[in-house]
């Protein structure tokens, strides 16, 4: 079984973990509908790219 030759320093450990953070969702404002939505997703009213693509259930 492999064992590290040297102890990992706090700096190296923290630099490695900088990519493990949570990202905030990409939210954009749709001016046509006056509503917020996630980028590249259908809005809650069923619109995408200014066109109706889904009927709301």
Curated annotation (Swiss-Prot):
GO biological process: translation
Keyword tags: Ribonucleoprotein, Ribosomal protein
Residue ranges of coiled coil: none
GO molecular function: structural constituent of ribosome
Domain of life: Bacteria
Keyword flag Calcium: no
Keyword Ribosomal protein found: yes
InterPro entries registered for this protein in UniProt: Ribosomal_bL32, Ribosomal_bL32_bact, Ribosomal_zn-bd
Biased composition (Basic residues): 7-20
GO cellular component, one term: large ribosomal subunit
Pfam families reported for this sequence: Ribosomal_L32p (PF01783)
Annotated stretches, region: Disordered: 1-22
NCBIfam families on file: rpmF_bact
UniProt record similarity statement: Belongs to the bacterial ribosomal protein bL32 family.
Protein name (database record): Large ribosomal subunit protein bL32A
Organism expressing this protein natively: Enterococcus faecalis (strain ATCC 700802 / V583)
Gene responsible for this protein: rpmF1
């Amino acid at each position: 079984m492999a064992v590290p030759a040297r102890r990992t320093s706090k700096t190296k450990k923290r630099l490695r973990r900088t990519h493990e953070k949570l990202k905030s969702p990409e939210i954009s404002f749709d001016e046509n509908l006056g509503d917020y939505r996630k980028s590249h997703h259908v809005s809650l009213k069923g619109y995408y790219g200014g066109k109706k693509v889904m009927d709301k259930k």
